[in-house]
Structure formats: C-alpha cells, structure tokens
Amino acid sequence: MDESILEGLSSVKGYLGGAINNYTGECLVCDAAKLSGNLEATSATFNDIFRDSHAVSKNLKLGATEIMEIHTEKAVILMGCSGEESRVHLHAFAVFNSDGNVALGKMALKKLLPQAVEALA
C-alpha cells in the first residue's frame, strides 16, 4: 500500500496529514508532509488510545468504537476503524487544521477504510 490511498483525505480543505495502522499500531502508510513531528510514532500512540476506546465502549456493551474525534487548540484529529470483524482490522488517522472541513474529512475517512482493507486482504 502506498500514500496514494490517502488522496481522498489529502484533498479535503485543511488536511495536514494522515496514517493507516494495523491493529497493533504498526504504521502501514503515513503522510506527514504538512506536519512537524513524527506522525508515524504519534499514530502508534493514537492507535493505543483508539484501542482503549474499543475496550471502554465494549465494557459498556456499546460495541466497538467506529470513529473518534479529538479537538486541540490548533487542529482536529480523526480516528476511524475498519471494523473488528473486517478481513483486516485497521485504524486510520487524519489531522486537519482547526478551520478544515472535518465533515468531509469524516466522509473521506469512512470511504478510505474499506479501500485499505481491500488492498491488504
């Protein structure tokens, strides 16, 4: 899998970077051209947070977490899951600046995950 799979996300207004990780946190593809810092390492930490949210929501009998949104002073981080029962369990991450089009980002993230699963299945 290469960075071209992130094109749908990268075309959204305000996109700063994105990554796709397997369930264990290994970064499979990463685009951090507009971000400072190490997105590959950071996405592994976000992966842990997302896995914890899976456990918490399942503990409450709500099912696995599908999408998560974190707002910071300068950005919005979206995290999405391909589904625990999908052929390949993936987590995708996207970072947008605070005035980016987060609604379109969510749609692009939901569209990207099945494509990534198909590419790896």
Question: For the regions a protein language model found, what residue spans apply to each?
Answer:
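Non-catalytic interaction/Regulatory regions outside core domains
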Residues: 1-17, 22-23, 27-121
